[in-house]
Swiss-Prot record:
It is found in: Secreted. It comes from Conus virgo. One of its GO terms (molecular function) is toxin activity. Changing D47A: No change in inhibition of rat alpha-3-beta-2 nAChR. The toxin is inactive on the alpha-3-beta-2 nAChR when the disulfide bond connectivity is C1-C4 and C2-C3 (ViIA-I) (IC(50)>10000 nM). Alpha-conotoxins act on postsynaptic membranes, they bind to the nicotinic acetylcholine receptors (nAChR) and thus inhibit them. This toxin selectively inhibits nicotinic acetylcholine receptor (nAChR) alpha-3-beta-2 subtype (IC(50)=845.5 nM). Residues 19-45 form a propeptide. The cysteine framework is I (CC-C-C). Alpha4/6 pattern. Negative results: does not inhibit alpha-2-beta-2, alpha-2-beta-4, alpha-3-beta-4, alpha-4-beta-2, alpha-4-beta-4, alpha-7 and alpha-9-alpha-10. In addition, it does not target dorsal root ganglion sodium (Nav), potassium (Kv) and calcium (Cav) ion channels. Residues 1-18 form the signal peptide. This is Alpha-conotoxin ViIA. One of its GO terms (cellular component) is extracellular region. Expressed by the venom duct.
């Protein structure tokens, strides 16, 4: 293979991996760790919003 062809193959691999990584940040393609983090954050916020002193200091509860 010539240098030009190797460069084109390299660019195709980089492009394909960047598209795959971009998809990983969306809903059903999200990793289990991301989903777990979101669920934990929702649980903490729900508990905080049910507590009046915490809800008063947290703008997400309003």
């Amino acid at each position: 293979m010539g240098m030009r062809m190797m460069f084109v193959v390299f660019l195709l691999v980089v492009f394909a991996s960047s598209v795959t990584l971009d998809r990983a940040s969306y809903g059903r393609y999200a990793s289990p760790v991301d989903r777990a983090s979101a669920l934990i954050a929702q649980a903490i916020l729900r508990d905080c919003c049910s507590n009046p002193p915490c809800a008063h200091n947290n703008p997400d509860c309003r």
